[in-house]
């Protein structure tokens, strides 16, 4: 839902559908209610590596970090997250095994739509 909504700023790629749970446990609502959650970082969708702002919370995938799958030729790497002490802000980017860095953004600054 978050990635599909053109109003939501996003960086990175989506190459396969997300596998959300069948049961809505209210986790996202609880994070919103807490008021101090800036983002959540997940993996498993092997070739998704995007970050999107959804109602003031960054939803971010890591990067393909395993080794060889039967259906992708993606080079492995990681999502780096650099928290800024005392600020409600973080930097994040994708760093591939070959040294390439892409989609370097500062949250929430890069996601503010004027």
Label for each model-derived stretch:
Residues 40-48:
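Histidine-centered catalytic micro-motifs
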Residues 10-19, 25-34, 48-114:
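Binuclear metal-dependent phosphoesterase catalytic core
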Residues 1-12:
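Metal-dependent phosphoester/phosphodiester hydrolase catalytic core
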């Amino acid at each position: 839902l978050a990635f599909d909504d053109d109003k939501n700023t996003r960086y990175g790629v989506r190459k396969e559908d997300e596998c959300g749970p069948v049961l809505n446990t209210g986790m996202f609502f609880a994070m919103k209610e807490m008021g101090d959650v800036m983002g959540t970082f997940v993996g498993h969708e092997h070739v998704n590596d995007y970050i999107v702002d959804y109602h003031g919370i960054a939803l971010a995938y890591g990067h393909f970090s395993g080794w060889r799958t039967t259906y992708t030729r993606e080079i492995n790497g990681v999502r780096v997250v650099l928290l800024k002490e005392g600020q409600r802000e973080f930097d994040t980017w994708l760093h591939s095994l070959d040294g390439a860095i892409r989609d370097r953004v500062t949250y929430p600054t890069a996601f503010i739509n004027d």
